[in-house]
Amino acid sequence: MTSLPCPLPGRDASKAVFPDLAPVPSVAAAYPLGLSPTTAASPNLSYSRPYGHLLSYPYTEPANPGDSYLSCQQPAALSQPLCGPAEHPQELEADSEKPRLSPEPSERRPQAPAKKLRKPRTIYSSLQLQHLNQRFQHTQYLALPERAQLAAQLGLTQTQVKIWFQNKRSKYKKLLKQNSGGQEGDFPGRTFSVSPCSPPLPSLWDLPKAGTLPTSGYGNSFGAWYQHHSSDVLASPQMM
């Protein structure tokens, strides 16, 4: 026997088998596209058509309910308070430990220059001045051993003795310069010649002895010699 293939039932066959199962029309199909039943039944249909036309496009709900408000939210950096509590106290401590910047040089006030402190002047006694003058008549410069010996004798330091000799030498040179300048100013263009009959001029080192010196101060030690020397020099031109 040969078997023939059975044809599959088509649409007509399904209608014939289930004649009572007809497709039920949907509620949305009975009304215009995009209109709800309440909108379609309202008498002011002309006013609702524009809004109904807008609803013709499919509306898709967002995946998350809060996504529709993301565009209106502020950034996270601006939403945080500016003066809120510090989250990292170690960073604040490190900033506080940084040294503060000094003001610019233009903002600094000019400071007055510091005055140099002058050392107090040494006051010499009359006995010390007498010994110092005697030694100066003998020599104007002292070696280190001589200076140390003289300082120990007089109860002074070597620096005090050194400074006294320096001041004495400068005063002595100033006196000689004034004396030579005064002679040239009184007799310009003339030179003094000493005749054989004139008394010899005292030398610069022919000073009076220390016993005849006054004890009031070393400044008067050259007073007598200066007067005697100037009188002899002035008297020599008259004897020519």
From Swiss-Prot:
SMART domains: HOX. The keyword Membrane does not apply. InterPro entries: Distal-less_Homeobox_TF, HD, HD_metazoa, Homeobox_CS, Homeodomain-like_sf, HTH_motif. Expressed in leukemia cells and placenta. Also expressed in kidney and fetal liver. GO terms for molecular function: DNA-binding transcription factor activity; DNA-binding transcription factor activity, RNA polymerase II-specific; DNA-binding transcription repressor activity, RNA polymerase II-specific; RNA polymerase II cis-regulatory region sequence-specific DNA binding; sequence-specific DNA binding; sequence-specific double-stranded DNA binding. Keywords: Developmental protein, DNA-binding, Homeobox, Nucleus. CDD domains: homeodomain. Residues 88-110 have a biased composition (Basic and acidic residues). It comes from the Eukaryota. GO terms for biological process: cell differentiation; embryonic skeletal system development; negative regulation of transcription by RNA polymerase II; regulation of DNA-templated transcription; regulation of transcription by RNA polymerase II. PROSITE patterns: HOMEOBOX_1, HOMEOBOX_2. Residues 80-120 are annotated as: Disordered. Its main location: nucleus. May play a role in determining the production of hemoglobin S. May act as a repressor. During embryonic development, plays a role in palatogenesis. It is linked to Non-syndromic orofacial cleft 15: A birth defect consisting of cleft lips with or without cleft palate. Cleft lips are associated with cleft palate in two-third of cases. A cleft lip can occur on one or both sides and range in severity from a simple notch in the upper lip to a complete opening in the lip extending into the floor of the nostril and involving the upper gum. OFC15 inheritance is autosomal dominant. Belongs to the distal-less homeobox family. This is Homeobox protein DLX-4.
